[in-house]
Amino acid sequence: METQKLISMVKEALEKYQYPLTAKNIKVVIQKEYNVVLPTGSINSILYSNSELFEKIDKTNTIYPPLWIRKTN
């Protein structure tokens, strides 16, 4: 998958879900919504190379419930 497309998918996930997302959450969202399999570390390399995106992710190691269980208001 090309890098620009993956970056746009990450941006879209960060905009769509208002609660804090970790890199692992983002990977799960993209894999579920776009029905793709991402290589290990692909999301991390995108986030670490793009400071704008890196600022937006949650880095506290807090465990959140899986995104598909959460209910939206």
From Swiss-Prot:
UniProtKB keywords: Early protein, Virion
Subcellular location: Virion
Superkingdom in the source lineage: Viruses
Family: Belongs to the asfivirus I73R family.
Upper taxonomic lineage: Viruses, Varidnaviria, Bamfordvirae, Nucleocytoviricota, Pokkesviricetes
Conditions for induction: Expressed in the early phase of the viral replicative cycle.
GO cellular component: virion component
Record-given protein name: Uncharacterized protein I73R
